[in-house]
Structure formats: C-alpha cells, structure tokens
C-alpha cells in the first residue's frame, strides 16, 4: 500500500505557480508649507494658536511618512523610494539628496542599513527645510504652496528611473500628502499644471494616490487625478493615526485596484473652476491654447493664463445679446381656466 502511494505521489505533477515579485518605486510628495499647517491647526482648535502647533502636526506627519517609506523598502529588496517636499519657496528633494551628509546621532546605529540611510537623510534635510521655512516667515515671503510643481518634478524623477531600469520591470506610483484648509483658493491657480500631471501619469501608467489632511472642502482637482489614474483618495481629519491609513489604504497594489473596492470617499466632482473668479462652473469659456476655463470674458481680450490674444470678432459675437424677432419680446399667454 505504501508502495502504491509513493508511486502516486511521485507521478503527480504539482502545479507550482511562480509568483513574480516585481520591485516598485514609491514617490511621495508632501506639502510642507508652514502657513497651511498653521491655518489647519487654527481651524481645528478654534483659537489663534501660533506656528508651533502647526510644526508639531507636520512633525507627526513626518514620523508616519518615514515609517511608511521603511515599510515599502521592507517588502522587496529592489524597492525604491523618493521623498519630495513642496514648500512656500518651491520644491526640494529630501530623499535621495545629492548634498546630504548623514550625521544624525539620533538615529540608532543598530538599525537596518536601508532604513538608516533613509531616516538620516530625511531627518537632516527636513531640519534644513524647517530653518528655511522659518526664515521665510520672518521675511514675509510668499506663503503659497508649490504642490503642482512638486508633482511635476516627481513624475520627471519617475520617468528618469523607469528609463534607467528598462531591462527590469519596475512599477511606479505617486503619493501626494497635502494639508487642506477651508478656503482652498491656491488650488484654483494650479489647475492647469495638475491637469498636465494627470496626462503624464496616465501615459506612464503611474497611479496617483492622495491623502488630504483637514479642511472642510474636498480637493476637486486631486480627486480627478486619482480617478483618472486608478488611484486612492482619502480625506482624514488630522495626523493622528496617519500611519494606519498609509499602511492599509495606500499599500494596495495598483494591479489589484481593478478587482477590489478602493476606500475612496464619495463621488468625484468633474466640474472645474474659473481661473479669474474661482467659482465652480459647469458651462464657461475655454481658451483654445492652454484650455483655461473662464466664467466671464477677461478684460483686455487676452487669456489670463497663457496671455494668448483672443479674436475680436469672436469676442464681439460672445458679448452680443440675443435678439428677438421684431425686436419685441414675446408675451406669455396666460389663460384663466
């Protein structure tokens, strides 16, 4: 009996499936504008708290991001990470960084080398960026976030890495962590750059994930970016428990997102905003050069975004009011029954 069983098991071919563990490139863009984080803290506390509370929330977000990057590196030895900060004066590569010389004694020397390199460089570069942000606050420079520019730089970095690794299959995805306020006026002027990022990410098959912290209004353009690239959009109240959101919703593999229910919140608003007034419009005027959407005809007969001149005949036709027959408006027939 044992001999029969041995021959049966020896003759049976086990169907072994080779699981392909493809390395992945994770690029994270973080909105580090101190002004935005201070505004968020004031809205949540309801008091005029100073910048220290905003910096505290930003540091809590940094801790979660570092753990998230280390977890991504732990999944596969071939995984790569990139961290970009969008601050008030532009964007900066926090990791990898060409001018970094890690010398942070607060990082344990017994840590895994891959984690230690990321932690040391990120903490050092973030410390330098904090000093620059505080100096910018004292000099009262522009406090607008450059989120769209950082997203463009992130996609440029992804494209370069994919070109360098053409022989090996490498997946890529982009995660955007932004701080939202109740106004969201700065996002209106980033509409065209964000649309360009959506087109580029779609062409590269790079999914865009978004985590918005705070704010009462959803980020319309970032929602459209996640929907167009099969990404995940999450709106959380604060930085508490951020690592739990990152380690669950943002770790879903892009190849599995078509067969599972993504943790997206609500429906996507596909309407756009007027470049001049900032109002959400469903019907408006569109520039044929840069696709800028306007709810009113701009003064000077030029596009406010790309400065392209408009045809005077078309402008006159658009400003012409509808003319009724015989020049007299028709009266409504009201019949009393």
Curated annotation (Swiss-Prot):
Belongs to the TFB4 family. It is found in: Nucleus. Its main location: nucleus. GO terms for cellular component: transcription factor TFIIH core complex; transcription factor TFIIH holo complex. The keyword Cytoplasm does not apply. Component of the 7-subunit TFIIH core complex composed of XPB/SSL2, XPD/RAD3, SSL1, TFB1, TFB2, TFB4 and TFB5, which is active in NER. The core complex associates with the 3-subunit CTD-kinase module TFIIK composed of CCL1, KIN28 and TFB3 to form the 10-subunit holoenzyme (holo-TFIIH) active in transcription. It comes from Kluyveromyces lactis (strain ATCC 8585 / CBS 2359 / DSM 70799 / NBRC 1267 / NRRL Y-1140 / WM37) (Yeast). A zinc finger (C4-type) spans 287-306. It holds the Pfam family Tfb4. The keyword Transcription applies. This is General transcription and DNA repair factor IIH subunit TFB4. Keywords: DNA damage, DNA repair, Metal-binding, Nucleus, Transcription, Transcription regulation, Zinc, Zinc-finger. Component of the general transcription and DNA repair factor IIH (TFIIH) core complex, which is involved in general and transcription-coupled nucleotide excision repair (NER) of damaged DNA and, when complexed to TFIIK, in RNA transcription by RNA polymerase II. In NER, TFIIH acts by opening DNA around the lesion to allow the excision of the damaged oligonucleotide and its replacement by a new DNA fragment. In transcription, TFIIH has an essential role in transcription initiation. GO terms for molecular function: zinc ion binding. GO terms for biological process: nucleotide-excision repair; regulation of DNA-templated transcription.
